[in-house]
Structure formats: structure tokens, C-alpha cells
Amino acid sequence: NKKTTIVSFGHRNPQGLYYSQKFDFILSTEHGPKGGDEINMNIQPFLEIKNFGWPISSYGEHYSKHYTEEILKEAPLNKSHKKFGFEEPIKFFNPSIGISQVVSINEAETEFFIGAMGNEIKEQDLGIHYIKLNNERNKIINHSYIPLNERVRDMIISKDKKTVVVFLETTSSLAFLRKLDN
């Protein structure tokens, strides 16, 4: 007998998922509609079911302006989550970066690489985003970008957290990012 538990809903198109059993949180990435890619944090996911807002709230837009009032009523894409009772993303990208995988790169589980598989290096969507969270893991305190000029489809990290294997879609190749000892 396997027991399953729903811990959240209101996700549009999840791409990356990281669960920390040690610190009890889930960090997820998801594609928004035309813009509005999100990084979502679910702290203590087993205490209460959280709603991240889709399709009521999104920082993206509908792909077409030719929607009926009925569709817009069901999916208004309000530009606030909190105002409508939903969890706000800890970060959203507008324009979209084509967000993909998320991996933790340190033992404290406060630093992460997030892949981007968009189309424009100038929009910071062909490479890897680095984020650092505060100790409570509810806010990004540092964000930078590593341009690769490649669509980053997936990443995995070694057990010692010193090597990240990056799956590059543009050239169908692998890259290795290694942490240098100081």
C-alpha cells in the first residue's frame, strides 16, 4: 500500500522539482504562458495544501487576444497571486526564459542552478541562472546569470556537490561545471 499526498496545486507546466527532506521544502520551476515563468517555494509542504494560482493568476499573458469572455472568466491571469489568496512565486521572469531544471549546489540547500532553454542570450534565457536563498528559504538574496549560448534542458549534480552535468539541447552535448577549490 502506497500512500500519496497532494501538497500543492495551481501549477501550469512544471519543469524542475527539488525536494529537501532535510529542510522540508519543495522548490519548483514552471513555464508560464507568454511570459511569467515562475520559481515557486513550498515550505513545510505537508502541513497545508498550497495553491500557486494557475489559471487565475499569472505574470504571463494569453497567447491570443481573441479569447471569449467565458475563457477570460475562468483564466483571467491576474497580475497578483497574494491578492487572490494564492502563493506568490519567489521569482518570475517576464519575458519568459524557457525555465527548466533546478538543482541544489550546496550542502545548506540555499544555492541553486536553474536552467533556461529560451531563444535569446540577451534575454538571459540561454544558460543557467544562479539563485541564493536566505536562511529561511523564503526569499532570493542573490541572483546572477551564466551565459552559455545553449538551451539548458536538464542538469544533475554529483553527490559531493562539486560537479554539475548540464544537458545542452542546442548542440546535443554535455557540459561539466566543476566547483574550484579556493
Located regions from the model:
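Repeated scaffold domains used in trafficking and secretory/extracellular systems
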Residues: 151-155
